[in-house]
């Protein structure tokens, strides 16, 4: 395994928050940090007429998150236990295929903008939950996940050279606390896919050897081969900015897509969607397969027709792959509406849509 890259990118471990530098090219990039290349006056006028779409699935997820967070803040531990048990038993999904049990735990996470006292207050609730339910796998996983998030909060997002010894010590200490909770709860009779989710995040932060990380991934997918977050986490760890070499994550994505009992091409597409912000021109700068991605997108659209995000992602990725016909099909479905979570800049949406319709870049 490659040495850790100076811990300079630790802040992006949990979610894909930043994009690559935009490159001047005649093909699309997923980055929205700069201006939109080659846009003309007509496209700017078209962009001004666009409407922000509201994804009903995202609304559903937000409502679920708010309710679970309210239960946590009100210390309704019995209700939390009942909800988590039901989500595990039913393997319930939102209408975009995301797992409700994962969002259950995400609901308790604090924001980086919140003061330290808010984190300490949350820690106290977690401890009360464990005291009230000492044999609960749910309470243990929630606390471990809290420690992982608290570690990144304490450390900050700067380069290693900007992190004080005290901050780095606190970071390592909290990751170790997360690992201790995970070890303690590992043999609990009830299992939860989020246990491996948190364990993999901890392992990445601690820089586990490849063989240990791979063993953990194998355990995770053996327990629940359709819990797509595990395969995404492994692919993410194989980015060149982490522990991989060029082509590593792409090879893993194909392996995950071919796994018996898994999600097939859908898994490949989910990995590409998750990593696109890190790879600039996805289908020019990497070995990612557009045919396999497109196959997965088609599966996602068939299974989850209510998700506007999937259509927006398909439109964006088709443009990046210069598949004009498929891009046009997706943009035609979207009309004059766009999802800001996929297209932060309406000008980019208008520019890409115009290319799909006319072939003019």
Named regions from a protein language model:
Residues 8-16:
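Bacterial N-terminal signal peptides
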Residues 20-23:
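Bacterial signal peptide processing site
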Residues 28-94:
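N-terminal mature-domain "stem" immediately C-terminal to a signal peptide or N-terminal signal-anchor/transmembrane
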Residues 138-142, 150, 315:
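Active-site cores of enzymes that catalyze phosphoryl transfer or operate on phosphate-rich substrates
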């Amino acid at each position: 395994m490659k040495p850790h890259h100076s811990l300079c990118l630790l802040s992006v471990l949990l979610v894909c928050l930043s994009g690559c530098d935009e490159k001047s090219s005649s093909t699309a990039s997923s980055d929205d940090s700069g201006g939109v290349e080659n846009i003309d006056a007509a496209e700017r006028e078209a962009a001004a007429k666009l409407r922000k779409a509201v994804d009903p699935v995202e609304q559903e997820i937000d409502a679920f998150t708010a309710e679970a967070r309210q239960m946590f803040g009100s210390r309704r531990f019995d209700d939390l236990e009942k909800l988590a048990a039901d989500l595990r038993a039913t393997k319930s999904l939102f209408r975009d295929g995301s797992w409700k049990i994962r969002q259950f735990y995400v609901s308790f996470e604090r924001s980086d903008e919140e003061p330290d006292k808010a984190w300490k207050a949350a820690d106290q609730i977690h401890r009360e939950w464990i005291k009230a339910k000492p044999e609960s796998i749910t309470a243990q996983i929630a606390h471990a996940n809290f420690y992982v998030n608290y570690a990144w909060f304490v450390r900050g997002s700067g380069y290693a050279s900007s992190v004080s010894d005290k901050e780095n010590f606190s970071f390592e200490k909290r990751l170790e606390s997360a690992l201790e909770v995970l070890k303690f709860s590992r043999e609990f009779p009830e299992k939860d896919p989020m246990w491996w989710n948190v364990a993999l995040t901890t392992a990445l932060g601690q820089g586990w050897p490849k063989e240990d990380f791979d063993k953990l991934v194998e355990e995770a997918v053996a327990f629940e081969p359709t819990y797509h977050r595990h395969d995404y986490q492994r692919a993410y760890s194989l980015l060149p900015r982490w522990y991989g070499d060029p082509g590593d994550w792409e090879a893993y994505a194909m392996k995950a897509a071919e796994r018996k009992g898994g999600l097939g091409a859908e898994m490949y597409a989910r990995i590409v969607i998750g990593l696109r912000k890190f790879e600039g021109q996805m289908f020019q700068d990497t070995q990612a397969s557009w045919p396999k991605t497109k196959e997965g997108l088609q599966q996602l659209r068939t299974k989850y027709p209510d998700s506007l995000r999937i259509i927006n992602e398909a439109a964006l990725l088709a443009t990046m792959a210069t598949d004009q016909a498929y891009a046009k099909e997706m943009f035609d479905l979207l009309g004059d509406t766009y999802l800001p979570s996929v297209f932060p800049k309406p000008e980019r949406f208008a520019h890409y849509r115009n290319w799909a319709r006319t072939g003019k870049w």
